[in-house]
Amino acid sequence: MRHPLVIGNWKLNGSKHMVSNFIISLRNQLSNMINCCNVAIAPPMIYLDRAKSYLTGSHIALGAQNVDLHVSGAFTGEISAKMLKDIGAKYIIIGHIERRLYHKESNEDIANKFACLKNEGLIPVLCIGETKEENEKDQTKAICVRQLDYILNIVGTQAFKNAVIAYEPIWAIATGKSANPLQIQKIHKFIRSYLFNHDQAIAEQVIIQYGGSVNASNAAELFNQPDVDGALVGGASLKADIFATIIKAAARAKKN
């Protein structure tokens, strides 16, 4: 049985004050939810150490929003997988459209980042998804396959053991417009079926999250879909009470 996973991607938001207040509040609101749902937050890199200190003793994990391809060296401004492991991060987001678009990261770059994370025993959270134009041309499945194939060809099927896939239709990210839950289920089922053709056991255990304007109002309906194993939450993860509501919705849906 797959355990639901909800991750908060803070993107370029936060402060020392926010980190401490947010985590204290979230811990209080989730105090009776031990082992009901896996939870992580991914603040900006500069706040990882502070977040880790406030997360200590809780079941909330630390995530990060990016990783570099290199272990060490003259790469100004970058963070390696080894460093993320050293600071206590567990879930590392890669392939997000904002990285693909603004930093020109290719599918090959993302596959190599995936490999770096696996080599350090960290859990990649691989973001895949299509643009509005690709969706309108009914190319969603083909785009998802292309993005998955880079991982399968470079790293191999076994790399998806203890990994996470986040289906994030690009047209739904930070727009307030979430995809229809039945459409989401259809794509999640397709992704799982595609992996099933490579390895049945891995397909059945891999966590497939949804990302794209997830909020307190639509979370319950999303999580009621059998192949939606959680969410990668953006803006709604910046307020502890809203994020807690989403987490509780995941726990309730997957408990039934």
From Swiss-Prot:
Homodimer. Belongs to the triosephosphate isomerase family. The keyword Isomerase applies. One of its GO terms (cellular component) is cytosol. This is Triosephosphate isomerase. It is an enzyme of class 5 (isomerase). Keywords: Cytoplasm, Gluconeogenesis, Glycolysis, Isomerase. Involved in the gluconeogenesis. Catalyzes stereospecifically the conversion of dihydroxyacetone phosphate (DHAP) to D-glyceraldehyde-3-phosphate (G3P).
